[in-house]
Amino acid sequence: MKNVFLLTLLLPFWGKTQISVQAYGGNKETEILGIYNKDFSNKWNYFASGTIAYEYDSKKVNPEIYQNLNYGIGKNWGVSAGVHISNKDVMPSVGLAYGKENDALGISIFPAFTYSTDAKEFGLGLYTLLEYTPKINERLNFYSMLIVESDFSFKKHQSSSQVIRLGLENKKKMQFGIGSTISQTGSNFETDVNFGVFIGKKF
């Protein structure tokens, strides 16, 4: 039921959008990553980043989505309200949004105040998406992507993750290469690393 709920959160907005989908096969789990970014007026923007991961050892499917509704208040800056949903927590947030994009570089940053409905605590969160795709020749671009997520209560670290992708992108916006997904949990920053390969497409 939760998987259906996560999917429906991405459906209300129609029209021209930026969509990126990646399939990732790692040594510990397989992941599907989707990024949805839409400017639907001069001021309003909707951003969502979702993953579905399948763990080989536990045979568990773990859905997760981070989404924000943003309102521009200045050049590249805005205010933001959203929610981070996983199988462990539902975490609403309010904060700021920063976005900038050109032919080779795209960056989105969302620092926010958060509330964990599981821990019943307020805290701080940060989501960052960075893509760098400089041109190599007429057929190929170098492709790199970094996603950083961190959640802290005012007492301790809760969870963080880093998604790293390095590879090539062709003229049809198909991407392929190597990568890793790194996660840290708890105050001791217990770390897990999932190395693998990916293939993706931008629409």
Residue ranges: model-predicted function:
Residues 79-106:
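Ordered, amphipathic secondary-structure segments that act as subunit-interaction surfaces
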Residues 42-48, 75-79, 103-108, 135-142, ...:
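Repeated loop/turn-to-beta-strand initiation elements of outer-membrane beta-barrel proteins
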Residues 191-203:
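Outer-membrane beta-barrel "beta-signal"
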Residues 38, 71, 98-100, 130-134, ...:
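Residue-level signature of outer-membrane beta-barrel architecture
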Residues 23-33, 54-63, 84-93, 114-125, ...:
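Solvent-exposed loop/turn segments connecting transmembrane beta-strands
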Residues 1-21, 203:
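Bacterial Sec-dependent N-terminal signal peptides
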Residues 99, 103-148:
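Detector for outer-membrane/organellar transmembrane beta-barrel domains
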Residues 18-66, 70-72:
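Start-of-domain marker
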